[in-house]
Amino acid sequence: MSEKSLDFIQNQINNAKFVLENYTKNKSGFVYSSRNIFVLIDKYVEDFLSNTENERWIIMPGLRGAGKTTILAQTYTKLNNTNFDSRRLLYIPLDKAVNTLGISLLDVLNAYQSFLGEKFENLSEKIVLFIDEVQADSNWGNIIKTNIFDVTDKVMVIITGSSAVALQAKNNADIIRRSRIEKLFPMNFCEYQIIKNSKYPIAKLKGKIKEAMFESENSEEIFSKLSLLKKDVNKYWSNIDDLEIENYITTGTFPFTVNKGQEKVFDNVNNQLDTIINKDIVELGTFDVKTLKSIKRLLYILADISDAISYAKLAKALDTNHVTLANMMEVLEKAEVLIKLSRLGSNLSKTTSFSKYLFMSPLYRASLLDVTGKINVYYTRQGKMIEDIIGSYLYREFVSKNTGSLEYDYASKGADIVLRLKNKKDIVIEIGRGDKSFEEPLATMKKLGSQIGMVICYKTNELKFENGVVKIPLKYFLLS
């Protein structure tokens, strides 16, 4: 047992409260609003302590900047403000322990048991552990399973980490069987309004809009159901400036960017992308220095293109081969920086030859365009940024839950996105900044025999049904 490990535990017990409070409120004492996932994580803790449920291992992976540490801080702070014994509440910033102090997760757990004077298998009272940036110790899964989960039911562990953590968990049968994974994605519009303006959504409206758009049998049914919600939709938007949509699309998808200047946000996000490449992606794949540098160049190219691009052209632009490029694309998908849409309706649909890529957050696209000096083409790329928003939503709600897949129609008059649900339903989606025609979705609907086509438009407030296609204002979609 090293003295360094014991000092670390003592410091965390004494000071974590003050460190984490900085994530929950500003210098004036104003308490920040929480994201939707906080309610879920808090419920897991309450159920564990009350013996209602026995979910004892919660894994919360997500992109850098999505607010993982803040969720831990809010959960820790709420519990610490009760009569729960603060000695049995431990926050572990594992990246600091491993990278700065040179102590492993196992060292930390052993030191904590020494501090308590109890082994985990002989605990008299329950404990809640918060482990931040768990990927700092590559053996985290086996350590938690062997030293906590398999020896006691009186310890709950809530961990955060990069997208690599989710992949490691899914590929380990022991972890996936024992844990619950709750991914943290970029903020939706309603979360953005909660965080920025303390503007809360209308009860049950989100579920009703989602049900109308994705559980209806045809476009006319979508139109009918959404028409019934018009009053509530208008009520929500009644005191929100339309510029808030543009602010959200450009800089509002991460909590740390809210109320910050655009240039500062772009600089921070570009630094964040560098960290993802140099740390998270290194954990997901084996690349030499030249290839790692090419990944950022690849992102610059993808930010500026308007549609699908062949791998041959990309490989030539990056002076690399097809295999290396395919590996680069795959690792950016695994890191959840990019969302892949396969080509619809051919043997190529599951290959990478002509895949289309969206960004998990439009802020990535805007920040990359800013670096290349092309932010002045913002309005010509705003349609793609709206597509990023919609693609990210569909990924979160369907792809990540394994209930659907995303494709696109490569034809010149084909639709932007096809959501292919596991129930064999195809939903054809066309997206635009201005007023779009019905031509593209109709062509793709005919090709697929689909009864559901929608056009989602930013610059329109009119809900409309025509020729088997429903036109939906972006204002409706953002509330789903």
Regions found by a protein language model. Name each.
Residues I71:
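Hydrophobic positions on the alpha1 helix immediately C-terminal to the Walker A/P-loop
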